[in-house]
């Protein structure tokens, strides 16, 4: 067997453009974000999420709901159904805080918190494996979709309804920004 050497060429690594060349870009980006943030036209409706970190009333409502779910001890599992930004933020946060073995810990070791599974694609094996593991009566479903019409969100909901029956909807929390227009 011939051994091949890997050569690393760093000659252009240190020849990066001076930061001054990017100042115009940063200024332009700041102006665009400021315009979006301060706009009173239709664009502001699409960027309402910008203010979410400052909406303490919404945070308090979510915290209160989560506290009730934990206190009632009715649920053991949480299944988050969403795609892209509707799922990735909570998934990254949960995985960065908890052990990768979180779902295998006892409820006592999880201090009463629920196990969490994410269905963020249309893979039938993933969906089947998650649904097979669940005790339906002990599962809360969190369905997140900006429009409520995303195929990758609707399909797992329809599968769950078929799998668990019409009572599935009684154990769902739907989060969408398109109130009144959502398909879910």
Regions found by a protein language model. Give the residues of each.
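Glycine-rich phosphate-binding loops that contact phosphosugars or nucleotide phosphates
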Residues: 67, 73-181
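Extended, charge-enriched "interface" segments that sit outside catalytic cores
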Residues: 1-72
């Amino acid at each position: 067997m011939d051994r091949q050497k890997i050569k690393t060429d760093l000659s252009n690594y240190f020849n990066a453009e001076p930061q001054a060349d990017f100042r115009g870009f940063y200024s332009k980006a700041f102006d665009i974000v400021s315009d979006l943030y301060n706009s009173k036209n239709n664009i502001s409706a699409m960027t309402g999420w910008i203010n979410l970190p400052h909406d303490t009333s919404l945070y308090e409502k979510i915290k209160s709901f989560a506290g009730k779910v934990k206190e009632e001890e009715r649920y053991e599992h949480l299944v988050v159904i969403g795609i892209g930004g509707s799922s990735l933020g909570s998934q990254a946060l949960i995985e960065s805080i908890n052990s990768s073995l979180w779902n295998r810990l006892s409820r006592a070791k999880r201090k009463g918190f629920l196990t969490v599974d994410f269905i963020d694609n249309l893979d039938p094996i993933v969906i089947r494996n998650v649904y097979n593991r669940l005790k339906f009566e002990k599962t809360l479903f969190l369905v997140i979709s900006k429009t409520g019409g995303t195929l990758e969100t609707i399909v797992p909901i329809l599968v769950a309804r078929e799998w668990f029956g019409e009572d599935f909807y009684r154990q769902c929390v739907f989060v969408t920004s398109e109130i009144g227009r959502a398909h879910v």
